[in-house]
Amino acid sequence: MARIGDGGDLLKCSFCGKSQKQVKKLIAGPGVYICDECIDLCNEIIEEELADADDVKLDELPKPAEIREFLEGYVIGQDTAKRTLAVAVYNHYKRIQAGEKGRDSRCEPVELTKSNILMLGPTGCGKTYLAQTLATMLNVPFAIADATALTEAGYVGEDVENILLKLIQAADYDVKRAETGIIYIDEVDKIARKSENPSITRDVSGEGVQQALLKILEGTQASVPPQGGRKHPHQEFIQIDTTNVLFIVAGAFAGLEKIIYERVGKRGLGFGAEVRSKAEIDTTDHFADVMPEDLIKFGLIPEFIGRLPVVASVTNLDKESLVKILSEPKNALVKQYIRLFEMDGVELEFTDDALEAIADQAIHRGTGARGLRAIMEEVLLPVMYDIPSRDDVAKVVVTKETVQDNVLPTIVPRKPSRSERRDKSA
């Protein structure tokens, strides 16, 4: 654009006026020039505006009742767990916002500490799905990790920092966004130490992993290898602060109910003690009476339990709940398969007793809600194989006999159209 200097051949930035000799790069456009410094400044302004736009105002943060209501649309039952999670998540993100806005000068400075969550309950009862649904609602990065793959640093297996890499990847390598995400660590009961007493031999996949997780659970500046795997001194690291990352750790904790019952039963010993029969102890929610001492006896170390102050337990799903899971949620399995059949121009129908039979099979197999899809696949496999090759099927009806006795679903033929009838008569 404008030229300066005696020779008239020295270009300058159209925005800041610096000459091409004063900057590293000068980029030409149709009638204008812009320098690298102005480009950097523009990028900084855009990033600041995007960051401001991403900040959720406190009055926009969903209230616990709204979080629970959202979960109701996807997860059947587990009311106590929903309430516990809703309050814990609300308080967690309220704490983050309080830190970003700074302390109110009218109040005494109070540091709000993080409350990670421990979820207990049998397999197939909705622990993972609850956490996934929460992350979807809040629109935050979410990562799932398997505790059984982790080992103490220096041994074969994954370092605990690889959990953080999954979160960073879920945030498209936006570290700032990842720092307010949710990490779900499953199968945490499998890293319990082998006995209640500390071992003199090194337990690299049990107690060693618990020790390694302590810092990132509490909040630390972690160095994460960008490609995963083991650390080595000649690679660059991604730095991430885990102070505002919410950790939800979960496990089935098979055998913990016996430890709880053993402790609760001891209350009946001695004069004047309250005697409780087995029938009086809540067996529908095995973990309703869990205490830190039970978890320590199970094999979790006290320091690990101390970093998981919120405990949410899920219960075994009964037949009624499994039937509701099949048909009521927004993405229920029955609705999914009806949609699949619609894409082939066929109507799919399940009778009420067919849904009950599917629920009975899931209970018999002990797989909970996770096993419902496998049963549906087994029941519908023959017709899903045949129907795409046929054009004479209008409707498929799945009955109780289809599920229990391996009878083929009832096929309702399609009535021929007028043109087809005309062609046949001709």
Curated annotation (Swiss-Prot):
PROSITE patterns: CLPX_ZB. Zn(2+) binds at residues 13, 16, 35, 38. Belongs to the ClpX chaperone family. SUPFAM superfamilies: Glucocorticoid receptor-like (DNA-binding domain), P-loop containing nucleoside triphosphate hydrolases. Signal peptide: none annotated. ATP-dependent specificity component of the Clp protease. It directs the protease to specific substrates. Can perform chaperone functions in the absence of ClpP. ATP binds at residues 122-129. It holds the Pfam family AAA_2. PANTHER family: ATP-DEPENDENT CLP PROTEASE ATP-BINDING SUBUNIT CLPX-LIKE, MITOCHONDRIAL, ATP-DEPENDENT CLP PROTEASE ATP-BINDING SUBUNIT CLPX-LIKE, MITOCHONDRIAL-RELATED. This is ATP-dependent Clp protease ATP-binding subunit ClpX. Coiled coil: none annotated. The gene is clpX. GO terms for biological process: cell division; proteolysis involved in protein catabolic process. Component of the ClpX-ClpP complex. Forms a hexameric ring that, in the presence of ATP, binds to fourteen ClpP subunits assembled into a disk-like structure with a central cavity, resembling the structure of eukaryotic proteasomes. It comes from Mycobacterium tuberculosis (strain CDC 1551 / Oshkosh). HAMAP family: ClpX (MF_00175). Keywords: ATP-binding, Chaperone, Metal-binding, Nucleotide-binding, Zinc. The keyword Nucleotide-binding applies. SMART domains: AAA, ClpB_D2-small, zf-C4_ClpX. GO terms for molecular function: ATP binding; ATP hydrolysis activity; ATP-dependent protein folding chaperone; protein dimerization activity; unfolded protein binding; zinc ion binding. Residues 1-54 form the ClpX-type ZB domain. GO terms for cellular component: HslUV protease complex.
